A protein has these predicted regions:
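Beta-strand-rich modules
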Residues: 2-4
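N-terminal active-site segment of His-dependent metallophosphoesterases
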Residues: 8-88
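Extended active-site neighborhood of metal-dependent phosphoesterases/phosphodiesterases
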Residues: 8-30, 85-178, 199-200, 205-214, ...
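Hydrophobic beta-strand anchors of alpha/beta hydrolase catalytic cores
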Residues: 43, 74, 147, 180-181
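Active-site glycine-centered loops adjacent to acidic/histidine catalytic or metal-binding residues
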Residues: 48, 78-79, 112-113, 185, ...
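Short acidic, glycine-rich surface-loop motifs adjacent to enzyme active sites
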Residues: 81, 172-196
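Functionally important transmembrane alpha-helices
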Residues: 212-225
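Short, solvent-exposed aromatic-acidic interface loops
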Residues: 267-274
Length: 274
């Protein structure tokens, strides 16, 4: 049954509540450092798969990054499912894709509005444990890249998470990271109102986050939500809205990123995967 209230007001815990629940897990388990197999490694990035009863492109994406020997990690930028009761289908499809015995890889998830609305937050945290975290990827020579994942699923980061972002980036200033990438669902900029009431942050919050990221040398911000690609340069920082990849899309893409001395990226069509 469609929860119409949730489409407008949301029925999930608000961001500060989600932060506190996630903090319990983070405090107990800490954050992850992954080992890259090469200096110039690959990250596969997708968003807005909106999994329902079909998971064709979702499973294709999983199989593709698992078979790439240069990829230690993939990132899903949110709206992994479309509506209520599809987390089981999503996870069953994920588990059904064979592992590659020759490599280790990890899927990192970002919470999207479709993932948490309609009372779905308990399901999201059941599978993904936390809505905010960072992870580090270390190359064979010891160079380290920082990926900061934060929750913007209902169009705001909240006061507690904003403070965590400040503290994390202040800590990062002292760590000599090669690159810093922020990963979230809601985008800073848009050319249309296609996503309605969940479109993006307030202007004040946009300015605060952009200033924070610029101050601490964030190289890129990856987001989804709008279902169409947009690339905006803000001084030295590149903000990318990645295309959606749901099965019904006519122009679906994922982003293939090479993390080296500079960050290169391209977009790969999966329109033929049906």
């Amino acid at each position: 049954r469609l929860d119409m209230v949730g489409m407008f007001a949301g029925t999930s815990p608000k961001i500060d509540e989600r932060f506190e629940e996630s903090k319990v897990y983070n405090d107990q388990h800490g954050f992850t450092t992954l080992q890259a197999p090469v200096e110039d490694y690959r990250v596969y990035v997708c968003t807005d798969t909106h999994v329902t009863k079909t998971q064709t492109r979702w499973t294709y994406f999983i199989d593709t990054y698992r078979q790439d020997s240069l990829c230690p990690v993939a990132v899903h930028l949110g709206d992994i499912i479309d509506a209520q009761n599809y987390f089981d289908e999503m996870y069953s499809a994920y588990q059904a894709v064979p592992l590659n015995p020759a490599k280790k890889d990890t899927l990192m998830a970002v919470a999207g509005n479709h993932d948490i609305y309609f009372k779905q937050w308990p399901e999201y945290i059941k599978y993904f444990k936390t809505c905010y975290y960072y992870f580090i990827v270390e190359t064979p020579s010891g160079k380290k890249d920082l990926f900061v994942v934060y929750d913007s699923a209902d169009g705001t980061v909240g006061s507690k998470q904003l403070q965590w972002l400040r503290e994390t980036l202040e800590w990062a200033d002292k760590q000599n990271f090669r690159h810093i990438v922020a990963c979230t669902h809601t985008h800073f900029f848009k050319r249309d109102g296609s996503q309605g009431h969940t479109s993006n942050y307030t202007q004040e919050e946009t300015y605060a986050l952009l200033n924070l990221f610029e101050k601490h040398g964030v190289d890129m911000v990856w987001s989804g939500h709008d279902h169409s690609r947009e690339i905006t340069q803000v001084k030295e920082m590149t903000c990318i809205v990645v295309d959606s990849m749901k099965d019904e899309d006519k122009k679906p893409f994922y982003m293939l990123v090479t993390m080296g001395e500079k960050i290169d990226y391209d977009f790969v069509s999966v329109a033929d995967i049906q």
